[in-house]
Amino acid sequence: MYSTECTILLIEIIFYFFAAVVVYDAIHKMANSPIFCIAVLAVVFAVSPKCFAQNYGINVPITGSLDVAVPNKTDDQIGLTSSLCIYYPNEAEIEINDNEWKNTVAQLLLTKGWPTTSVYLNGYADLQSFSNNPQLNCDYNIVLVKYDQNAGLDMSELAELLLYEWLCNEMDVNLYYYQQTSEANKWIAMGSDCTIKVCPLNTQTLGIGCQTTDVATFEQLTATEKLAIIDVVDGVNHKVNYTIATCTLKNCIRLNQRENVAIIQVGGPEIIDVSEDPMIVPKMIRATRINWKKWWQVFYTVVDYINTIIQAMSKRSRSLNTSTYFLRI
């Protein structure tokens, strides 16, 4: 069997042989016929300008990806074609105590290019209930979280929960052992009182440093928490124990970033820096902090910097809620 290079060489030899025969025959005819000679010269003069013309892409080499970002040159305002949801704790509405306060905020956002019909202000009772069913359905979603050092809910874990999409399934710890298979595989516990204990198992399903029949020997990972994202050693089976009546535990895979969600911490000595959590890959900047004074001051600050915040986000590509992508069963 001939190689590709050999085949190409044979084709070139045959081509040049026939070309030489044609040229020889043409020269012979031109010598005997002035009319044929004039016709050949006319064809050569007609074709030559095309041969030396500018090449606009026939042989342009492709050296990289064609999937490049094309900047938007229209400079359209985002607010004219997008919806904006701002989520706030109900205590803000109680403190403001003004029936028209939402309309006021909407009118102020109008000065920043957001039509009043595109802005939605949604309150939530507490972070526990909100984290269980966030309903982040706008093109851009901003969550205001008031700092509370006494809260059982870990706000950095709430940030990880909201800033990523998760694919989850319920865990039946009475029937099965569970293991985490990768860095993106976590267990998410939610409820009013989540105390999680585990017993790692060896290949013979015997406890490592614990007894599978004695919960008192299990390692305790959380204590009376409302939300916990649990990380254990990958590739090791675990027997899990928790109070089913006050907590739900789900086996989850962290998927893509929710780039249309941003979290603003209100008050507190330091910012929720979810990017510093070793569980978070890749790093992100959609979590920030503003000083706490009064809730009116908070909303004024949000309005003033709304477009700066939006620039760190991306418009949603699908609806995000518990029934679709947040905690999909």
From Swiss-Prot:
Leader peptide range in chain numbering: 1-53
One of the record's GO molecular function terms: metal ion binding
Coiled coil: none
Keyword list, A-Z: Calcium, Capsid protein, Disulfide bond, Glycoprotein, Host endoplasmic reticulum, Host-virus interaction, Metal-binding, Outer capsid protein, Signal, T=13 icosahedral capsid protein, Virion
Binding-site positions, Ca(2+) 2: Q180, D231, V232, D234, D304
Disulfide cross-links: C85-C138, C168-C252, C194-C247, C199-C210
Quaternary structure (record): Homotrimer; disulfide-linked. 2 Ca(2+) ions bound at each subunit interface in the trimer hold the trimer together. Interacts with the intermediate capsid protein VP6. Interacts with the outer capsid protein VP5*.
Protein name, UniProt field: Outer capsid glycoprotein VP7
Native source species: Rotavirus A (isolate RVA/Cow/Germany/993/1983/G18P[17])
